[in-house]
């Protein structure tokens, strides 16, 4: 971890020493700014039972700039597009250097528990969520079974 800002070293040490329940985040062996993340689908959500792989990258400007995060596992969610990009205010205009990797991961986990079709990234999924929520939830469960189980 030579040459890394002290803050990144401290955050990484804390993530490894005190993992967030349901979330595993490990720095890549060759690049300590790149994290392999696995989030367990939250209980009582359409994603329950799934394990979702994400990648998180800390740009040179971090913590003045937000981490770059995306889902690697396909997910049927109104706030995640086909490329795995996530619509989350703290990853964009609401980012603050006071926030940490841990906060970002908790916010993504919360987004799985409470999809927000009113601020969509995947418009087709959001429309389905608004017009027929039961059907959208069933599709999300089916995608979870298909793409997020037995995938680790």
UniProtKB/Swiss-Prot annotation:
The active site is at residue 87. Keywords: Acetylation, ATP-binding, DNA damage, DNA repair, Isopeptide bond, Nucleotide-binding, Phosphoprotein, Transferase, Ubl conjugation, Ubl conjugation pathway. One of its GO terms (cellular component) is UBC13-MMS2 complex. Activity is inhibited by binding to OTUB1, which prevents 'Lys-63'-linked polyubiquitination. Activity is inhibited by GPS2, leading to prevent 'Lys-63'-linked polyubiquitination. This is Ubiquitin-conjugating enzyme E2 N. Conjugation to ISG15 impairs formation of the thioester bond with ubiquitin but not interaction with UBE2V2. Pathway: Protein modification; protein ubiquitination. Belongs to the ubiquitin-conjugating enzyme family. PROSITE patterns: UBC_1, UBC_2. The gene is Ube2n.
């Amino acid at each position: 971890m030579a040459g890394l800002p002290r803050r990144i070293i401290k955050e990484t040490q804390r993530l490894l020493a005190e993992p967030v329940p349901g979330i595993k985040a490990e720095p890549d062996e060759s690049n300590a700014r790149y994290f392999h993340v696995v989030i367990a689908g939250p209980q009582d959500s359409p994603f329950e039972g799934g394990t979702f792989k994400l990648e998180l990258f800390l740009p040179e400007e971090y913590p003045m700039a937000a981490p770059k995060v995306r889902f690697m596992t396909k997910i049927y969610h109104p706030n995640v597009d086909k490329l795995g990009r996530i619509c989350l205010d703290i990853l964009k205009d609401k980012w603050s250097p006071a926030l940490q990797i841990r906060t970002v991961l908790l916010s993504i986990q919360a987004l799985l528990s409470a999809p927000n079709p009113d601020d969509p990234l995947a418009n087709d999924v959001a429309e389905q969520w608004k017009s027929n929520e039961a059907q959208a939830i069933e599709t999300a469960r089916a995608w979870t079974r298909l793409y997020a189980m037995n995938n680790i």
